[in-house]
A protein has these predicted regions:
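Signal-transmission linkers at sensory-effector interfaces
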Residues: 1-22, 30, 163-173
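Helix-loop-beta substructure at the N-terminus of cytosolic sensory domains
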Residues: 11-53, 61-64, 199-213
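Short beta-strand-to-loop transition segments that serve as allosteric relay/switch motifs
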Residues: 58, 126-137, 239
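Regulatory sensory and allosteric helical modules in signal-transduction proteins
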Residues: 60-103
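Signal-transducing coupling segments at domain and membrane junctions
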Residues: 89-112, 289-299
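A short, aliphatic-rich beta-strand micro-motif
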Residues: 111-119
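Amphipathic alpha-helical "output/dimerization" segments
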Residues: 120, 137-158, 215, 306
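Histidine- and acidic-residue-rich, metal-dependent catalytic cores
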Residues: 169-327
């Protein structure tokens, strides 16, 4: 019996999505060595914003931490509406592009590009970009191969995003029950999650954060107080100051949140979702303090997970800058 090594076996493993994209690019380069970059941008339908998400570049990517509204990029908006791919055949077209993202790509020396829109059951998710070092590289044979790899990458990305969204939806449903008891508004959670994303982006260079991490913080941050489901109403809804004993019970919501998330991950079979520890850390450690006086573990400084620090700042910032009459 002949044995053969599966060149894409990493796609069946729980490695981060970017590692899977890099490996896929390496396999593609065995056939199309002039493809020097594969990148994925995802679409936020609430804000009509297109955000960089993944790239296969071994170096610093020219479009890391970049976003734009779909209406500000008419050619991409047309692809979204029509569902068709786009070919830019030569460097002149790239260099003359008026949009910042096109100019950045041109300055990196990429000479041509092929863009595929991502759809799942008719719902638009974003784009896949194949950038070439050679002009006029996209003949029919090449395009057939890129279509195959593009759909593979699309399924890989959408499958992971759907898994994360299902997890977030499940926990959000439980979290909504909390907000029926504790009147934390959905607008507050939406604002603070976007503040968290802005903070993470501003720290990206200092902490070498990639777009995938930033998106996880954005998606998971509204779930920080899920543990309040385990707090009795007479404490959670008490209008006056809590007693010392009541404060002790209230502070257990951080640990309870971590326990609830662990149970949901196990029950839904989502333990293997990459970066799920970001969610665990946000729920458990968002009340820690830089000086070590927080809870539940009394962590201090850099021992507090970065995502928990980001969410804590975003939460407090919104509380201080928004009128919330129930507070």
């Amino acid at each position: 019996m002949l044995e053969r090594h599966d060149t894409l076996e990493c796609l069946n493993q729980t490695s981060p999505l970017r590692e899977k994209l890099v490996k896929t690019h390496m396999v593609l380069n065995n056939h199309l060595p002039f493809i020097k970059r594969i990148a994925v941008a995802i679409y936020d339908p609430k804000t009509s914003v297109l955000k960089t998400y993944l790239h296969s570049s071994g170096k610093e990517d020219p479009l890391s931490h970049y976003q734009t509204t779909i209406k500000d990029t008419p050619s991409l908006e047309a692809l979204m509406k029509q569902g068709n791919p786009r070919i830019i055949k030569n460097k002149v077209t790239v260099e003359r592009g008026r949009h910042e993202h096109t100019q950045r790509i041109g300055r990196e020396g990429y000479a041509a590009s092929y863009t595929l829109p991502m759809f799942y059951n008719g719902v638009f998710f974003g784009f896949i970009f194949f950038n070439s070092s050679e002009t006029d590289a996209f003949n029919e044979t090449t395009l057939e191969q890129l279509d195959l790899y593009g759909h593979l990458i699309s399924l890989m990305v959408i499958n992971e995003i759907n898994s994360v969204q299902t997890l977030v939806a499940a926990i959000s449903t439980a979290s909504h029950m909390t907000h029926l008891r504790d009147p934390e508004t959905g607008s507050h959670l939406d604002r603070m999650s976007r503040y968290a994303r802005l903070i993470a982006k501003s720290l990206a260079e200092q902490y070498q954060l990639d777009d995938e991490y930033i998106e996880r913080v954005f998606m998971f941050s509204p779930l920080h107080d899920i543990g309040k489901l385990g707090i009795p109403d007479q404490i959670l809804l008490k209008p006056g100051k809590l007693t010392e004993e009541e404060q002790t019970i209230m502070r257990t919501h951080a640990t309870k949140g971590r326990e609830m998330i662990d149970n949901m991950l196990a029950n839904f079979g989502f333990d293997s979702i990459p970066d799920v520890d970001i969610l665990r850390n946000i729920a458990q450690f968002h009340h820690e303090s830089i000086n070590g006086q927080g809870y539940p573990a009394g962590l201090s400084g850099n021992s507090i997970p970065l995502e928990a620090r980001i969410v804590a700042v975003a939460d407090v910032f919104d509380a201080l800058t928004s009128r919330r009459p129930y507070k």
